[in-house]
């Protein structure tokens, strides 16, 4: 059974382990450098009151996914940026759907009007996930250079609240 709840400081190390496994696997995130729990904790607390973080946990309270929304300098104030990460080997089990139910409600409560997702064009699973949640394509970034020098295209998707 998967439960979703707001992320707390004690989740940061587990979230970092989950994210680092995704980064090491490659191919789905634009992140290329491993993160620490302290890095994520800093990001969780560095918001302007317009961010929210949720974790999905199994029956043993182990983090199996997490999602956040936050404002972003490149977006208008009524838009939030979203990021979703599910444990390697656990995709397609409804974890992302449960996370988005909580995140969507929080985004509305925070006053956002729409949510932006930047997805690598070669991340088929991510594209399918956001499409299945009702996100619509609205743009594309060609030739995005990631921190490791790799060049990818990004699909921009939008969810109107």
Residue ranges and their predicted role:
Residues 84, 148-161:
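Terminal substrate-recognition subdomain of acyl/acetyltransferases
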Residues 107-119:
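Conserved GNAT acetyl-CoA-binding A-motif
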Residues 15, 19, 40:
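Hydrophobic pocket/interface hotspot
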Residues 14, 81, 125:
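Amphipathic alpha-helical recognition patches that constitute DNA-binding helices
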Residues 6-9, 28, 32-89, 100-102, ...:
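Acetyl-CoA-dependent GNAT
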